[in-house]
């Protein structure tokens, strides 16, 4: 079956996606859709975006051969795409600069965002400061308590941080609150959504801004290995860092020339939390069902009555109970494989990379590293695996120190 990576005019990837929004929000979403349609291919806009990504954010980021980890595991050659080195400490900056610049062009004076781990909140706060936009970040109370360093950074950057005390007080509740705020303020406010979810055009727009990751990897791996990788691996929350890595390798969207992108295996790693046999996980594709939330049709964790269940992960950025619609489509198509890693596996991976390579990964990224630790040793030594190291782990040190002691990792 052909992998069509373009959504239709109504924002559907196959049966997934769409615009499930109240009437009051339709003018805001339509305004955004038309503005993005006009600017995405505008040469001046793209040149300005490229300028800020290079000179402000520090692109391109390195593609690093993890020689020590490769030798220790004894299998596939492991490369790390170093998004942790991007200004702000994670891949989120690619999207926040793009959307904030778009908001500025639309004449908006205020941006709002949801955040879980805090990295998107930090990235949005940075972009707000850069472009002179009033900024408010909605963050679940639970996440504000476990991500204090990022809360402090957001405030330092001039953003208002609003704790959310409804529901389970985590990421999905922050999204709910941000959408409510946008409904009342969209005339002067842009909702800078942080991942490839939500109503059309957000999944496509965020993916496009993040695709710089995969475009660079494609060029860099050809320079270093003279061929494409065998495996691309990324963690999955809502799924933006993974879509950013995967999308340029989906064969109908690139001019492949002599390289054979259709043979590149793509693997997304969800949060298995305390185990997939428990209710404490965030594995929406592995354990979820089709449903509608936050303006889109996708896979969500639900109870028998179709009510959204709480997601759990030791990583604040992976405890969203759903998945972006393009991921749901690629899963159904079989083009991308989805696996999972438990808290304990992620913590072990965090420690392994830190002590083997001297690189401290985010707990989110550690889920992808865990896949390599479990599987790379069984692969051929000529195989090449690229892992998206989506963020740095400074924000997670307190969580890791406490958890490692309890779990004995």
Curated annotation (Swiss-Prot):
Enzyme superclass (EC): lyase
UniProt-listed CDD domains: Trp-synth_B
Provide the family line. Belongs to the TrpB family.
- One Gene Ontology CC term in the entry: cytoplasm
Reactions mediated catalytically: (1S,2R)-1-C-(indol-3-yl)glycerol 3-phosphate + L-serine = D-glyceraldehyde 3-phosphate + L-tryptophan + H2O
What this protein is called in its record is Tryptophan synthase beta chain
User: Where does the source fall among the domains of life?
Assistant: Archaea
User: What does the UniProt record say this protein does?
Assistant: The beta subunit is responsible for the synthesis of L-tryptophan from indole and L-serine.
Please tell me whether the keyword Amino-acid biosynthesis is annotated for this protein.
yes
Q: What is its EC number?
A: 4.2.1.20
Q: Which cofactor does it need?
A: pyridoxal 5'-phosphate
Keywords for the protein's UniProt record, in alphabetical order: Amino-acid biosynthesis, Aromatic amino acid biosynthesis, Lyase, Pyridoxal phosphate, Tryptophan biosynthesis
Q: Which organism is it from?
A: Methanococcus voltae
SUPFAM superfamilies recorded = Tryptophan synthase beta subunit-like PLP-dependent enzymes
């Amino acid at each position: 079956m052909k992998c069509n990576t373009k959504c239709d005019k109504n924002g559907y990837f196959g049966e997934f996606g769409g615009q499930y929004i109240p009437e009051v929000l339709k003018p805001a979403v339509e305004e955004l859709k038309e503005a993005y349609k006009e600017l995405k291919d505008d040469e001046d806009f793209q040149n300005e975006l490229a300028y800020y990504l290079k000179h402000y954010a520090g692109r391109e980021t390195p593609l690093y051969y993890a020689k020590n980890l490769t030798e220790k595991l004894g299998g596939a050659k492991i490369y790390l795409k170093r998004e942790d080195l991007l200004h702000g400490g994670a891949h989120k900056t690619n999207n926040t600069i793009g959307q904030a610049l778009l908001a500025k062009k639309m004449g908006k004076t205020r941006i709002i965002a949801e955040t879980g781990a805090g990295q998107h909140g930090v990235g949005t706060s940075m972009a707000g400061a850069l472009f002179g936009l009033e900024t408010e970040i909605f963050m679940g109370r639970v996440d504000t308590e476990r991500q204090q360093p990022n809360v402090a950074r957001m405030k330092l950057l001039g953003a208002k941080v609003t704790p959310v005390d409804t529901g389970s007080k985590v990421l999905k509740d922050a999204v709910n609150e941000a959408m409510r705020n946008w409904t009342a303020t969209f005339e002067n406010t842009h909702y800078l959504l942080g991942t490839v979810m939500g109503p059309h055009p957000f999944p496509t727009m965020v993916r496009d801004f993040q695709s710089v990751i995969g475009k660079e990897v494609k060029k860099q791996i050809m320079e270093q290995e003279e061929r494409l990788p065998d495996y691309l691996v990324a963690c999955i929350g809502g799924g933006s860092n993974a879509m950013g890595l995967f999308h340029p390798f989906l064969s109908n969207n690139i001019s492949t020339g002599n390289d054979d992108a259709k043979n590149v295996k793509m693997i997304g790693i969800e949060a298995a939390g305390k185990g997939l046999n428990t209710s404490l996980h965030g594995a929406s594709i592995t354990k979820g069902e089709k449903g509608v939330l936050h303006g889109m049709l996708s896979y969500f964790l639900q109870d028998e009555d179709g009510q959204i269940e709480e997601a759990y992960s030791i990583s604040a950025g992976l405890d969203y109970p759903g998945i972006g619609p393009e991921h749901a489509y690629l899963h159904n198509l079989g083009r991308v494989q989805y696996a999972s890693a438990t808290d304990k596996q992620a913590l072990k991976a965090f420690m392994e990379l830190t002590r083997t390579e001297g690189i401290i990964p985010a707990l989110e990224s550690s889920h992808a590293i865990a896949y390599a630790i479990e599987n790379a040793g069984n692969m051929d030594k000529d195989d090449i695996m690229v892992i998206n190291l989506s963020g740095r782990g400074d924000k997670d040190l307190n969580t890791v120190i406490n958890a490692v002691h309890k779990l004995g990792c």
